């Protein structure tokens, strides 16, 4: 058996870079036990902003002095770069099985947010209310749960590991979904919808970290694309099934079907999902070696040596600090939150718009959401087709082959044109009762633009905040969920006041104004990231 000294070896540079990059999304704080206050907002102009680049993770590299580790025989690390216990070295079937199951869970949670939308008129009738605010809030309150969940679940995953968060969250999700099906009044339904979102936020909050734990840099793009489809495609697909189900069996059966589906997925998760969090795995290894060797001084390479309460509180505060003090994080989060809110704005009103203006039945109106979903799929295809090519071309042309976060921006220029165009088409063609395929084309174009912007902004945040990418993404996710929850609350009232044409035009004008953000970030983003005034102490 290898001694504890063997676990202090510095891995080869290439593998170490990959590990540092792979643990960035949700484990950035775990490499800084001797440097708890680090400037993270900026990387200088010469640094490659891609995860895994040594200059990009300079703070983490400094905190983990390899020479110091070699001098300390009590540091427990992986058994070299090929250690089979390292999730990045798992067999392909095990690795991609985890990715597949996690992606399915991540798809199901947003699916549940909107699958209920076509049944809202039935709920209002059953509970004897005609309050339009309650109609949209029943959908929105779930998103508020998704906004609150990451603030608690992400820090807990750093203390207890990722897989336990998934399993416990899945079981609680089933319980609260059943409670929704059994609700006897509107307040009860709203409360349990919120709890469903709260406990279901785990895959969205920490799923990116699991993907990063499992995959190498070469594999990560494909895995992240598959996983990221869930939060974007799920809300668009849900109402398709929900429409026919509510028409045939009633709105309560939507929740029964969700509970049954979640039960099957939970069983699959228990059978397939395994812990990938490096801090948790190395801590387990440390405890085992302490028992085997009797050396109580052994400690994990990733052990922060701080109280769990301190780590928990620090992790909760970090996203808020980035959102408030970093202009890059704030601007991108607001931009992505606004366009993401358009999904739920449309979802919460499609039923009323197409039933009132085109006479669609509950079952048929669910098919309307397919247009938005197709737009999302086309957006992923376009992003994958042009994103990496543009980034490589700009890096070769402008920076001697070294990528920068700003090179993620160009695809958003296309998206910034698609969103207002789609909103104008959708709003005015519905206003004048143009054949239903035309407004759906507008919804498709808007969905395509929404998808491209969300993927591009997430990639920018990961590249720019490499060490604390998880916190930057958490900040963006929370703001995005808040926008997604609140926009539907005034959707119907805005349509009643302005009409469908001018109501959607107002949103389109805001999107046009925000179109200035991408070029400004492309030309001035690096300057903002490196400016001393905007360095954030975390």
Swiss-Prot record:
Where does the sequence pass through the membrane?
A: 100-120, 134-154, 163-183, 194-214, 225-245, 253-273, 327-347, 362-382, 409-429, 436-456, 482-502, 505-525
- Where does the record place Basic and acidic residues bias? 1-12, 20-35, 65-74
Record region (Disordered): 1-35, 65-90
InterPro entries the UniProt entry points to: MFS, MFS_dom, MFS_trans_sf
What coarse category fits the chief subcellular location reported for this protein?
Answer: membrane
Provide a Gene Ontology MF annotation, just one.
transmembrane transporter activity
* A GO CC term attached to the entry: plasma membrane
Q: In what way does this protein cross or attach to the membrane?
A: Multi-pass membrane protein
SUPFAM superfamilies in the cross-refs: MFS general substrate transporter
Q: Where does this one sit in the cell?
A: Cell membrane
Any keyword Nucleus? no
Q: In terms of domain of life, where is this protein from?
A: Eukaryota
Name the UniProt key words of this record, in alphabetical order: Cell membrane, Membrane, Transmembrane, Transmembrane helix, Transport
Q: Which family does it belong to?
A: Belongs to the major facilitator superfamily.
Role description = Efflux pump that might be required for efficient secretion of radicicol or other secondary metabolies produced by the radicicol gene cluster.
Indicate what this protein is called per its UniProt record: Efflux pump radE
Q: Which organism encodes this protein?
A: Floropilus chiversii
């Amino acid at each position: 058996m290898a001694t504890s000294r063997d676990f202090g070896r510095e891995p080869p540079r290439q593998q170490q870079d990959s590990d540092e990059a792979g643990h960035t999304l949700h484990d950035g704080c775990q490499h800084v036990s001797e440097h708890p206050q680090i400037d993270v907002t900026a990387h200088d102009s010469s640094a490659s902003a891609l995860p895994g680049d040594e200059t990009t993770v300079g703070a983490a590299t400094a905190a983990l002095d390899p020479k110091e580790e070699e001098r300390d025989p009590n540091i427990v690390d992986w058994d070299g770069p090929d250690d089979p216990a390292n999730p990045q070295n798992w067999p392909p079937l095990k690795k991609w099985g985890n990715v597949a199951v996690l992606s399915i869970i991540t798809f199901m949670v947003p699916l549940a947010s909107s699958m209920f939308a076509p049944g809202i008129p039935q709920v209002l009738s059953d509970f004897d209310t005609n309050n339009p605010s309650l109609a949209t809030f029943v959908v929105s309150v779930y998103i508020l749960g998704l906004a609150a969940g990451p603030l608690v679940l992400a820090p807990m995953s750093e203390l207890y590991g990722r897989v336990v968060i998934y399993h416990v969250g899945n079981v609680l999700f089933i319980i609260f979904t059943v409670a929704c099906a059994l609700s006897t009044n509107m307040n009860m339904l709203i409360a349990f919808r919120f709890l469903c979102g709260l406990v279901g936020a785990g895959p969205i909050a920490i799923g990116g970290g699991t993907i990063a734990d499992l995959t190498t840099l070469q594999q990560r793009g494909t895995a992240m694309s598959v996983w990221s489809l869930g939060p974007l495609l799920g809300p668009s697909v849900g109402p398709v099934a929900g429409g026919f189900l509510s028409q045939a069996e009633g709105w309560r059966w939507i929740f029964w079907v969700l509970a049954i589906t979640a039960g099957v997925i939970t069983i699959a998760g228990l059978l397939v999902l395994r812990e990938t969090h490096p801090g948790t795995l190395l801590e387990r290894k440390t405890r085992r070696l302490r028992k085997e060797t009797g050396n109580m001084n052994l400690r994990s390479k990733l052990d922060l040596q701080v109280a769990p309460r301190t780590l928990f509180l620090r992790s909760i505060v970090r996203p808020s600090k980035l959102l408030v003090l970093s202009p890059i994080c704030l601007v991108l989060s607001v931009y992505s939150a606004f366009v993401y809110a358009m999904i739920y704005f449309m979802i919460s009103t499609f039923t009323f718009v197409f039933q009132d203006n085109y006479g669609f039945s509950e079952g048929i109106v669910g098919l309307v959401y397919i247009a938005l979903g197709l737009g999302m799929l086309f957006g992923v295809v376009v992003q994958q087709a042009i994103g990496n090519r543009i980034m490589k071309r700009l890096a070769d042309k402008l920076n001697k082959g070294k990528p920068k976060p700003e090179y993620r921006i160009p695809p958003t220029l296309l998206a910034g044109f698609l969103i207002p165009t789609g909103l104008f088409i959708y709003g005015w063609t519905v206003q004048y009762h143009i054949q239903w395929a035309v407004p759906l084309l507008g919804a498709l174009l808007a969905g395509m633009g929404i998808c491209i912007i969300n993927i591009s902004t997430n990639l920018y945040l990961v590249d720019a905040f490499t060490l604390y990418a998880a916190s930057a993404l958490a900040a963006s996710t929370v703001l995005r969920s808040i926008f997604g929850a609140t926009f539907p609350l005034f959707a119907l009232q805005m349509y009643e006041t302005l009409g469908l044409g001018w109501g959607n035009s107002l949103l389109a004008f805001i999107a046009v104004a925000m179109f200035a953000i991408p070029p400004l970030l492309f030309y001035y983003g690096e300057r903002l990231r490196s400016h001393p005034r905007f360095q954030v102490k975390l």
